[in-house]
Amino acid sequence: MNFYRVEQMPGFIKTEMQKIQKAVQPFMKKTVIYRFLAIPLAAFSLFNLAAFLFHASADRESLISAGIFALLAALGLAFFKEAGYQHKQIQKTVHIYMLNRIKKSEILSEERKSSYARQIKEEPFAMRSFVEFLTEEDRRKKMY
């Protein structure tokens, strides 16, 4: 989801996007932190572990170092997996928000609301359908 284009959108869409952004902000913060930790930690550890395995001897001190690098690599990969889980939570939260927003609409008919809800459930990136819904709702609101 690209929140950078929000500033170019009409006010009624901008308001809804800001509400979505506010709902997913805690998940986005966690995702950024986990990825920020995961990538350097895993890359550093895996690189050192690979270099260590090719150039080190098999004494006790070397095995402890290898174990530490393996543990750090596993930690980095776990952070990366958690970042992926947080990203899925973001998508789920956005979908739930959009579906609830469509259900709450008092301007569109039940048929149109169910059509938009179906489109959002079927599309992997449903933002376009949600923007169409908001545009149609605003257009009908101005008519009445």
UniProtKB/Swiss-Prot annotation:
Any Pfam family hit: DUF5392
Instruction: Supply the alphabetized keyword list.
Output: Cell membrane, Membrane, Transmembrane, Transmembrane helix
Task: State its location(s).
Answer: Cell membrane
Answer yes or no on keyword Transmembrane.
yes
What's the protein name?
Uncharacterized protein YwnF
Origin: domain of life: Bacteria
Membrane-spanning ranges: 31-53, 63-80
Q: What is its main location?
A: membrane
Q: How does it sit in the membrane?
A: Multi-pass membrane protein
Which is one Gene Ontology cellular component term of this protein?
Answer: plasma membrane
